[in-house]
Amino acid sequence: MAYTFPSVELSSAPDSADTSKKYELGALGRTETGNMYRYVQVDVSDGVDWAAGHPVYIVYGGDSYECSADLSDAGTSGTGTNAAGIATATVDVSAYTDGTDTVYQWIQVAGSASVTLHSGTDVTNGLHVVWHDDGTVDLMAAGEEHLSMGYCIGGSGTTSLTIQLQGML
């Protein structure tokens, strides 16, 4: 028996946030390029704004599909949490009131994505990356294999990388 995931066909990569829920939380969307996205609620309770290309995580102890760009909201103090996806749009969380306002966004969960590399790091094609701090990724170290967000497929040795996402669906 074949199993297929229900998904939304997107005409292009999403690049904006919604202040009203347009899809079911957790819905998958895909573009004709093969990139896949998941519809989530933005956690507006913290002080870390969302920006395209920044990793996001399921809020520790939060509601299903509520995500944050704040590493401390990911359930640890420092690295050690698996990414839920990559933000596709900017959200100024200070413009919203927690408990009153809701914001929704597609996050990228599969395909190739542009991310920001932590300064001073040299990542070459084929090497895996993990979240380093709010908004940047870093070269995966020994013992962090389970945290890999994907591997570099372009932009080696620069501050901007293209990675092939993995393990986020």
Model regions: which residues?
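Surface-exposed, low-hydrophobicity beta-strand/loop segments enriched in small/polar/acidic residues
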Residues: M1-L169
